[in-house]
């Protein structure tokens, strides 16, 4: 048995004009739909980590509005069964008008020979738990439906 560890993730729930932002990603040969964000780096706080993720992925800065949800059940990592995922979600908004490319359909990825991703806006009234890949994102989608 390998070393068991925690994997802390931070994600932004970005709502704009009645839609929520998701990313369609091709990672390690798998199609994944999730909320924007990613892993915390050592020495980073959750808010700074989320801001960094948005600059890296979208090329834009976000404002953190408030905490939305933190994982409250056990979830092993999809990529490392010896790792427990703890995800923290914040409601965010862009500091300027979104200027990154957005796709209309799921998995309109330019290159499937390497890890890649694309942003997509989903109407909040249409978001379903099954639209997202990971169990924690599914929980957040369910919470969004009750807003």
Positions of the model-derived regions?
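Conserved N-terminal beta-strand and adjoining loop/helix that marks the start
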Residues: 1-21, 39, 91
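A generic structural micro-feature
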Residues: 2-6, 32, 80-86, 111-116
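Conserved Nudix-box catalytic region and its N-terminal flanking loop in Nudix hydrolases
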Residues: 16-56
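Short loop segments at secondary-structure junctions
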Residues: 16-19, 26, 93-98, 124-126
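Nudix hydrolase/Nudix homology domain
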Residues: 30-33, 99-101, 105-147
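Internal catalytic or translocation cores that form aromatic/hydrophobic pockets or channels
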Residues: 51, 70-73, 85
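A short coil-to-beta-strand element that immediately follows conserved catalytic motifs
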Residues: 61-70
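Active-site-adjacent beta-strand/loop module that shapes the phosphate/pyrophosphate-binding cleft
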Residues: 75-104
């Amino acid at each position: 048995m390998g070393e068991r560890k925690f994997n802390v993730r931070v994600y932004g729930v970005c709502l704009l004009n009645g839609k929520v932002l998701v990313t369609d990603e091709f990672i390690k040969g798998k199609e994944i739909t999730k909320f924007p964000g990613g892993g915390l780096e050592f020495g980073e706080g959750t808010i700074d980590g989320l801001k960094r993720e948005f600059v890296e992925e979208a090329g834009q800065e976000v404002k953190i509005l408030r905490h939305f949800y933190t994982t409250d059940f056990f979830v092993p990592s999809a990529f490392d069964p010896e790792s427990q995922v703890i995800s923290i979600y914040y409601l965010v908004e862009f500091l300027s008008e979104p200027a990154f490319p957005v796709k209309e359909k799921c998995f309109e990825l330019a290159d499937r020979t390497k890890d890649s991703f694309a942003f997509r806006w989903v109407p909040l009234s249409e978001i379903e738990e099954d639209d997202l890949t990971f169990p924690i994102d599914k929980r957040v989608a369910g919470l969004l439906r009750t807003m």
